[in-house]
């Protein structure tokens, strides 16, 4: 079962939803990078459960502990291990799931593939696994800040159950995003979006939507041709997230409806810098960043656990009715925002280190 992501900067996440804890081992982090538990904690706090009435009411502080890889507040260049204790695990709430497959969860597929599964909250398939990603992204972000200090990664909720926030990706700010519990940057229709979630919650249901992300201050040259294209690695990163079902960059599927004359991004000179007048490419051409804003969208399905009766089957093949129990998000989107940002940073720092290695090679050996 693969649990590692990255090439030069690698994370390996571990732990189960209702086990003793979850965490991450980070390998490939350069030495002498300032790093504290507070750097990690501020990102975990944005992801943790129980933040508001529209997130799961599981009460976890998600306190990060660095167990290895630092000394006197600096990275050593050795593996960094980060641990978060599960403080509010309630495995007994899932006793019924030992014999029943939850619809649209990983219960059946894990059992069919491995012949065993952790039925207490889904184990590794739980979104609690993303704590390791966010912690790893916090460390990756510190390295990225050192290599390319002008890079800024901002994600936000842009759509809830068909309702769009209608904000300008090029001008949205961190303050706009963090101004409300939904991480919805448009105050004008925030109330309508919240009502959509609350309506589903009252009916024992859930809703999905879209998280958008923009990266400003991108350098030219991140990404590798063919199989390690920047957008390909971003797609893998985002589609590996729990509940994610779609990824598009730049024009995305809209580009299929355009002509080449409409879709091409004309070049022009801004001083001594090559720029593009439009950005349908989303900041990537040939799998390599072109210096424009990196812009993409991630679609998330409705949370699969709902408080309504559903038809399913038992492990013995008997058709049964299930009303799910447990504490779950009516909408995963606000907590997905920092996770999307973390995975973006992990992809970028990995490619940044690869690019720095290339830049060590002289352009000419004459």
Curated annotation (Swiss-Prot):
Transmembrane segments: none annotated. It holds the Pfam family Chorismate_synt. It catalyses: 5-O-(1-carboxyvinyl)-3-phosphoshikimate = chorismate + phosphate. Keywords: Amino-acid biosynthesis, Aromatic amino acid biosynthesis, FAD, Flavoprotein, FMN, Lyase, NADP. CDD domains: Chorismate_synthase (cd07304). PROSITE patterns: CHORISMATE_SYNTHASE_1 (PS00787), CHORISMATE_SYNTHASE_2 (PS00788), CHORISMATE_SYNTHASE_3 (PS00789). GO terms for biological process: amino acid biosynthetic process; aromatic amino acid family biosynthetic process; chorismate biosynthetic process. GO terms for cellular component: cytosol. The keyword Signal does not apply. GO terms for molecular function: chorismate synthase activity; FMN binding. Its EC number is 4.2.3.5. It comes from the Bacteria. Its cofactor is FMNH2. Pathway: Metabolic intermediate biosynthesis; chorismate biosynthesis; chorismate from D-erythrose 4-phosphate and phosphoenolpyruvate: step 7/7. NADP(+) binds at residue 47. FMN binds at residues 124-126, 286, 301-305, 327. HAMAP family: Chorismate_synth. This reaction introduces a second double bond into the aromatic ring system. PANTHER family: CHORISMATE SYNTHASE (PTHR21085:SF0). Homotetramer. Belongs to the chorismate synthase family. This is Chorismate synthase. It comes from Methylacidiphilum infernorum (isolate V4).
